[in-house]
Amino acid sequence: VHFPLRSRQLRLSLLASSLLIAMSAQGREKVSVDLPAAPLGEAINALAQQSSVQVIFASDLGAGRNAPAVKGRFTPEEALQTLLKDSGLQVQAKDERTFVIVAQGAPASSLVTPSVPVEMAQMEITASRTSSSLVSATRQSTVLEHEQLQELRQGSESLATVLAKAIPGMSDSSRTITEYGQTLRGRSMLVMVDGVPLNTNRDSSRNLANIDPALIERVEVIRGSSAIYGSGATGGIISITTRPAGGENRAETSLSATSPLTRLGSDGLGGQFQQYFAGSQGAVDYAFDFGTRHIGASYDAHGGRIAPEPSQGDLFDSNIYNIGGKLGLHIDENQRIQLAVSHYDARQDSDYATDPSVAKLPAGSVPANAIKGLDLDEQNRIRNTLVNLEYENLDILGSRLSAQMYYRDYFTRFTPFDARAVATRGGNVDQIMQNSEVFGSRLTLRTPLGESGSTELVWGGDYNQERSDMPLDVFDPAVYDASGGLVFDKTGKLTYMPPLRTRSAGAFAQLQHRFDEHWSVDGGLRYEYSTAEFDDFVPLSESTAASPVAVKGGEVHYDALLSNLGIVYSPVLGQEIYASFSQGFQLPDVGIQLRNARRGFDIGASNLEPVKTNNYELGWRGELGSNTLGTLALFYTTSKLGDVQSFNNGLILTRTKERIYGAEASADWLSDDAVWGAGGSATWMRGREKPDGKGWQDMTGYRVPPLKLTAYVQYKPTLEWSNRLQATFFDAKDYRLDGVDSFGRHQVSSYTTVDLVSQYQISADDKVSVGIQNLFNRDYYPLYSQLLRNNNNTSHLPAPGTVLTASYTHNW
């Protein structure tokens, strides 16, 4: 079977998810279907997305055929039959969730011939620029659908941890609120929700904590440098799609409860309630969801309370609220407009602080210690509001158009920090906040070229405008010291980073062409132009001076022309080999320069050139026998300048030449009867950097993780019951230079985690799940904790011990 990346993603996703999720009767039960009239291939893709079944079809069967609008409640097979009416095609069921489309009168086996490429229906984001129904993709990616993601959540405490365990090439999560140090192929990730970027220029490293996983319909992680959406994806893209509007009126109620098993009690209890409604009335469709979640205390393998994370923060003892809605209008059979609004608010209210006395002991010798009695009015918080207006036209002068306008209002507050030894922060005990307001728009068009249907131009543009500032509260140091780090008496407010205004505009064009069933190619260009400006301000480094000197405001401009080219060769059905070159783009972190500014700072002379990466990749994906799918990727990325790196809380800012190379491999196996399945992945990479005046040296552990191995075994004895045992291993590594410990450079130990998830479909409308995280109660420190973000034991946080999660879902 031949399957380009978009097809392989679905095939792999469904192969694995047949092991991951109880899809007991998806081929037999009726599902809500709401499909506009569209080209046949697009209609099949959309049906696959709405019904989560596997559809196999020859690529040339969809050419020149259109499908009628389909709306109502159907089994997937009934919906496919309606789409294929009067098309000369028919659907054949291979099993209850796999269907084959063939010419009328032809046997399903006619697909498996040397000359006919076979595809699997693509689960596509409407305005996606990275997927194509024409050419095979020249990069690796992983897709997690809603049911699969919700199951994996049973064995992980956050979206960041779910992805760390499931995605090759991704570093481990911190087990806290931050994804600082959680890289993708050693570089930064662009995180988007329904096409809206969550990254800001002064990145707070809380992007994956800005959305509740219960609201997610689909996550696609695309690995490798990309500029297709603009800045931020030097390591790859995490594209999140929220629950959809439309279809037959329906509702879903979810309840869950979580408890640590190493210390039973009310402090550790957590839980979530989530309600989702969706449906349609005539040409109008809607979705509405709301929910609340409580996160309790976290306990290590010995039953000790895990201390707060003092550098980047955490959400222990927090309450989270979310509410959102979508309202769509089908203007006609080709046009649709949708307005989506969502609000997410996570607020901490804890009685515990971290004990500052452990910082006096040798680094890494003792764990961080939680002490009770915290007196702090305003604690860690994330507040995120999104407004998103989308318009789609399936036929505008022969092109397909997707347009988007969005607004984002973002606020976050960090943990207080004793910065009296940090001159660039004014020598205070303080607490930082960040305010960001973002406006933006995107335009994407897909234009067929020629009459053969073998060439397509994807083109468009983007605009993004951001305003961010970082105030900080100052606390009385004498009160802080006298209380042992428990009492924070606010004495004033200062400016850490002044209002920073950035604007970016970009245009791109991507040409895609399929030569025949063996060869396809795509390539393109993107031009990006950006500005950043700020007004005069007094930096914190001058706050204690007798005559403070202001830094003069200024403006900086930068641009970049980026290219990509890839080719895919399919020597035989079921095998693909690809080679690609792509460039990524990262706007310079102007904010980190401003907040660490000293007297005489000149924006024109600072390290503000953008990061431009070159990514080279060779890869393979294919079948290994009739029941196994495999992938392999070799990658090499370079950049003349890396990100602005801040060491010792901004006392040292540096940029270096960088090169990162590595390999990823994965395999998934499913038995003929779909009762047993197994799989795993391996990721190895090495990063080297060359500071000015020095030779090449290994990069820090916050950039390049050690060897990572994952494995799972799935057992599904009945259609209703599925069980998954999964393991994740990170190897030991010495990140020190010449045996000397420094920021991000410590000797780290290996660790293995094992999780167990079991699901049972009680009825067509009811499902229960049980998950056990850290099944064997392993006592370990995640990579983030071993690297000591604060350079002392206050950041030496053990991982949670065994945690039990139980959930129940009812569909109305």
Give the residues covered by each predicted segment:
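Gram-negative outer-membrane beta-barrel transporters
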Residues: 254, 517, 530, 626-645, ...
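Extracytoplasmic beta-strand/coil segments of soluble accessory domains associated
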Residues: 99-102, 126, 160-197, 217
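Transmembrane beta-barrel wall of Gram-negative outer-membrane proteins
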Residues: 265-300, 304-351, 383-394, 451, ...
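A beta-strand signature from Gram-negative outer-membrane beta-barrel systems
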Residues: 211-254, 811
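Short acidic/polar hinge/loop motifs at secondary-structure boundaries
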Residues: 181, 196-223, 275, 647
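C-terminal beta-signal and adjacent terminal beta-strands/loops
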Residues: 635, 729-736, 759-812
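Membrane-embedded beta-barrel scaffold of Gram-negative outer-membrane proteins
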Residues: 390-392, 400-418, 568-570, 576-588, ...
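Face-selective signature of the C-terminal outer-membrane beta-barrel domain
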Residues: 330-344, 380-541, 568-570, 629-634, ...
